[in-house]
Design a protein with these regions (language model features):
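Core segments of cupin and vicinal oxygen chelate
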Residues: 2, 10-54, 58-61
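Glycine-centered loop/turn positions within well-structured domains
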Residues: 52-54, 89, 131
Length: 139
């Protein structure tokens, strides 16, 4: 079986504010961003990889989630964090952008195990809604 991660849904309170954070601070390209701004899309997304996006959905949208998934308690079911792997140069540049935008790096580590083996360095920080992101690089 060939499986790929298609998308994640992140609950946010202000979609435009979150879109700005993920585009301008993190540096991820928007998907359907203009259509959302024009009222032609229910939610914006940002592209993580060629095959994976992060949907930015409002808490209000969670009301219909249990009905569509058929899983009791699935609306807003919490995750601990999600992790993005980048190159060393992008990692260093992101640290600068986070500081410029007043985003506190709340945790860090070295030699941390992940999907590609042992990451040289890793950092954790919250998005505007408190969703925790980890960013790391592998050498």
């Amino acid at each position: 079986m060939d499986v790929r991660l298609d998308h994640l849904v992140c609950w946010v309170s202000d979609q435009l504010h979150s879109l700005h954070f993920y585009e301008q601070v993190i540096g991820l390209p928007g998907v359907r961003a203009e259509a959302f701004r024009e009222g032609k899309a229910a939610f914006p997304s940002v592209r993580i990889t060629a095959e994976t996006i992060l949907d930015l959905m409002t808490y209000d949208a969670s009301m219909g989630v249990e009905e569509s998934t058929g899983v009791k308690g699935s609306a807003g079911h919490p995750i601990n964090h999600f992790c993005l792997a980048v190159g060393k140069e992008d990692f260093d540049e992101l640290q600068v952008r986070l500081k410029q935008h007043g985003v506190e790096i709340t945790g860090s580590g070295v030699n941390s195990f992940g999907a590609q083996g042992i990451a040289s360095e890793t950092m954790f920080f919250p998005d505007p809604d408190g969703n925790v992101l980890e960013v790391r690089y592998y050498e």
